[in-house]
């Protein structure tokens, strides 16, 4: 899934996402934006991209930490596809067909989503 890839993580990214990336043999780095030797950039901030000619940026949205791969072509058109659906704690399963990893949410989160009071 992420094998042989290098990623840049900023301070907004949860440690679970970094650990997940590393579990799939990806290399993690904390570097200033503009550094060119990484394949993916992770940030919680929406629409925050690394300004490089060819890059793939992953954006994380709280509370589910949904990450989307954004591929930028030479024609400047944007193509988005899901890469990681990151909930809170334990790994649930990996779907290699759509290159997605799902992490299990906390039980209290599930109850809240079902309309129950915490």
From Swiss-Prot:
Q: Give the domain of life.
A: Eukaryota
Asked whether the UniProt record includes Cell membrane among its keywords, one would answer no
Q: Which GO terms describe its biological process?
A: cell division; meiotic attachment of telomeric heterochromatin to spindle pole body; meiotic telomere clustering
Give compartment(s).
Cytoplasm; Nucleus; Cytoplasm, Cytoskeleton, Microtubule organizing center, Spindle pole body; Chromosome, Telomere
Q: From the Swiss-Prot or TrEMBL record, what is one GO molecular function term?
A: protein-macromolecule adaptor activity
Record keywords, A-Z: Cell cycle, Cell division, Chromosome, Chromosome partition, Cytoplasm, Cytoskeleton, Meiosis, Nucleus, Telomere
- Tell me, in one coarse class, where this protein mainly resides: cytoplasm
- Output the Gene Ontology cellular-component terms: chromosome, telomeric repeat region; cytoplasm; meiotic spindle pole body; mitotic spindle pole body; nucleus leading edge
* Main function: Involved in chromosome segregation. During meiotic prophase, connects telomeres to the spindle pole body by forming a bridge between the telomere protein rap1 and the spindle pole body protein sad1.
How does the annotation summarize its subunit structure?
Answer: Interacts with bqt1. The bqt1-bqt2-sad1 complex binds rap1.
Q: What is this protein called?
A: Telomere bouquet protein 2
Instruction: State the organism of origin.
Output: Schizosaccharomyces pombe (strain 972 / ATCC 24843) (Fission yeast)
Upper classification of the organism: Eukaryota, Fungi, Dikarya, Ascomycota, Taphrinomycotina
Gene responsible for this protein? bqt2
């Amino acid at each position: 899934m992420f094998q042989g890839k290098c990623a840049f993580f900023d301070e907004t990214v949860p440690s679970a996402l970094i650990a997940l990336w590393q579990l799939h043999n990806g290399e993690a780095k904390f570097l200033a934006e503009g550094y060119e030797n990484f394949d993916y950039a992770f940030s919680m901030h929406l629409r925050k991209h690394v300004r490089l000619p060819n890059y793939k940026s992953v954006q994380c949205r709280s509370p589910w930490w949904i990450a989307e791969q954004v591929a930028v072509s030479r024609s400047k058109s944007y193509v988005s596809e899901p890469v990681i659906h990151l909930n809170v704690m334990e790994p649930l399963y990996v779907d290699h067909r759509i290159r997605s990893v799902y992490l299990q949410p906390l039980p209290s989160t599930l109850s809240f989503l079902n309309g129950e009071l915490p």
